[in-house]
């Protein structure tokens, strides 16, 4: 007699239909930790090894939903590299990414199959080139002028900084923030969990997500507004 199973392992993932969760198997998690420790000891790895390691991290996303936030600076090391045997020395940002997989990945290696129900909060933000920034939600308005050191930043940085400030001001615990911005570029960087050729914008996206996750919430883009031209 065949008994139905409530737990299935496939490609390093364990699917549990009783608990409604997906987890990395112990073997897969231990392998990632071992590879990370090895790279840390050497201060880097070859291009081929880095590509293989990043492939393992990408494959973990079903169980570790915030995985992308913790490999973008390692991913950036691939840019311009072609020789599989070339040794790539990790910079400080990449080392921080790597350390997260050693210290914290296991704690995040199980995720619910259904997203938790969170109260929704819509926030609309805007950033002016020279004047300042602002935003509003059902909780009211927030606005300020740029500081002198911020005035000469790129407009995409300003759009993301405006979003960060408004989220920090308006968001409460366990809310799903839906944010609307003017910049398509900034929208894509936030949605992709910090995928960008710019290290500055990657860092800004990480700061935004840090606020969201520290409040046990989530973030999605509610589209972007195309600027009107006269």
Q: Where do the language-model regions lie?
A:
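C-terminal reverse transcriptase regions that engage the nucleic-acid substrate
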Residues: 2-112
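A short, polar/acidic, helix/strand-boundary loop motif
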Residues: 38, 137-161, 169, 185-196
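Short coil-to-beta-strand
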Residues: 132-141, 174-181
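Two-metal-ion RNase H-like nuclease active-site motif
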Residues: 116-130
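Acidic carboxylate-rich catalytic motifs and surrounding loops in phosphoryl-/glycosyl-chemistry enzymes
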Residues: 1-9, 123, 216-230
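RNase H catalytic domain
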Residues: 167-229
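Mobile genetic element proteins and their domesticated derivatives, centered on retroelements
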Residues: 10-12, 32, 36, 54-55, ...
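Flexible loop/turn segments at secondary-structure boundaries
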Residues: 60, 67-70, 130-133, 142, ...
